[in-house]
Amino acid sequence: MKFLQSLNGRPLRVWGLAALVAWLIFQVTRLALLGHSVMLSEQAPAGLLGGVAMGMLRDLPVVLMLAWPWAMFELIFKRKWADRLRWPLWTIYVFTLIFVGVSEGVFWDEFSVRFNFIAVDYLVFTTEVIGNIRESYPVGKIVAALAAFTLLIVWALRRPLRNAVAAESGRASQLVWALSLMLAVCFIGYKLPLPEFFTNSFANELADNGWRSFIAAARQNKLDYRQFYATRPDAEVMADLQRFSGHGQVSASNTGLLKASHAPSKQPNVVVIMMESMSAEYMETFGNKQGITPNLDRLAKEGLLFTRLYATGTRTVRGLEALSAALPPQPGAAVVRWPNITNLNTLGSTLAARGWEPNFIYGGYGMFDNMNSYFESQAYKVTDRKLFQEGLVQFENVWGVADEHLFDQVLINMDKDVAAGKHVFAHIMTTSNHRPFTYPDGRIDIPSPAKREGGVKYADYAIGRFFEMAKQKPWFDNTIFLIVADHCASSSGKTKIPVFRYHIPAIIYAPKLVVPKQVDTLASQIDLVPTLLAMLGLEGDDHFVGRDILKMPPEEGRALLSTYQNVGYLKGDLMTVLQPKRKIETFRISADGKEAQLVPNEQKMTDEAIAYFQGAALLMEKHGESGRGSGR
């Protein structure tokens, strides 16, 4: 421990020791994440070492930020109180550093990134998150082990800390150090940019620091498109957006007058089943050999299958946004998370104007991610786990009830509404294919709790069971079902927007109404809303940005993808990525979507990309200006 006691032969001060300990723990954390990337994400070590080296420098402002309170501690407290408080606070400090490092490992295992806006959200929705952690990991044993390890580290550091205390000088000198640290943090941490130096996203994440990324995400949970991204004249953007949508008007507000189409007695029910984290790669239809989705594969053969459909994002709220408002993804938080958004142009409002009864049915607590508030504000009738029929739920975990119980509630709701003469539109959100992957025993041949394969197979079992029961209902033959994922199970990849991590299944199933077919046109999640409306005979009644996939020329197919800060426009094998600071890059995407080669920007692609994403921002601005975005 001698190297912890002095630097260049001079004894460390307390803040210096605190800084050095933090820096060392950051390096251990980074090496652990490097090992995870190499062994589990199959990344080449040589491509990541630059990120590791860069990260050692990027840690400095965070290290100084963590050291500054120790300089203030020694300055403010008199020796008597400082001696009493120093060891307990030092123990808490070391434990916090270790705990955050382990937490970063858990988060990386799930998302392959440093802390981001998802981690910020997790601190808001503590019930689900803490419950999920408790059900997924032996928390008590982990915390006990971390506490024991902390005590061991503190004991090992007892002499360096004593020497550091002895090295403290007069208050004038301590004040100079405290002010110097504060200025250094402000200058290095806020004035100097932190660009992405590497084309490999894993390397960029390794070069970052979890403390820094968390603070940045907390400060930037909503991004103003005009301020940060490339723009074009508004009039040109809106003209292009109307042309791309295939009709004369697009809108964020529900202001359109719907034409008469179906007679009320012939209106089919519409059921959208959004499956949690159901990546296309899990289905045999798309090449999987594990046999974990037999029911989905059967439905894909018997229904209308979209083989090249891509999610707009990597979170449930993005999927909900796409399948309700059909808006291109915007940087920052999804519209579902925005407060006080009312009377938005949604699939539910469009159908409600023609006599359907909109419902949102969720297996979890709808307060999570603002789901209940969002859908209630759009005039959906909301049913979450709190409102399920008493005695119905026999199995649940922190994220939600078992999918089979969710579907049982759906059947109850639909029976009741149909019996009352209503035409039902139900948007259903499942939860079982989510960590901790627990489900009722005896349903599938993978025991619970399980890994992802178990969650996928149980979710497939539940949907198969649902359709077997639904087929016995008198309303089944007059119901159109859309089965689609909210997003993929993983968002990790080597590129800024790893295309293969956005490929999701989408199946329209209605044996008496829809002819089985395979559609290979490249399409976006937002296109499913106009496609459904066109199938219902309501083509032209909507004002959405998406297009009817069935009438879209294959050469005009495109997908809209997003991370938190980057938005991508995929057309053919090219993807244009719009980034903060008005940066634009274009990549040639490999056939499997896993590789991306940087190529020169193409003006036509750039203009189209800006039209979609700037256009979405303009629609929401106009929505707010109309007064329809004000409080309920």
Where are these regions (language model features)?
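Transmembrane and membrane-interface helices of multi-pass
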Residues: 2-224
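Short coil/turn linker and secondary-structure boundary residues
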Residues: 7, 43, 120, 124-125, ...
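Alpha-helix initiation and N-capping motif
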Residues: 25, 126-127, 208-211, 222, ...
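Short alpha-helical "patches" and their helix-cap loops
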Residues: 84, 225-236, 336-340, 546-547
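Long, well-ordered, tryptophan-enriched scaffold segments
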Residues: 138-140, 144, 236-240, 375
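Short coil/turn segments at secondary-structure boundaries
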Residues: 145, 197, 226-232, 427-429
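Short coil-to-helix leader/linker segments, especially the first N-terminal amphipathic alpha-helix
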Residues: 221-223, 227-259
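Solvent-exposed soluble domains appended to multi-pass membrane proteins
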Residues: 245-632
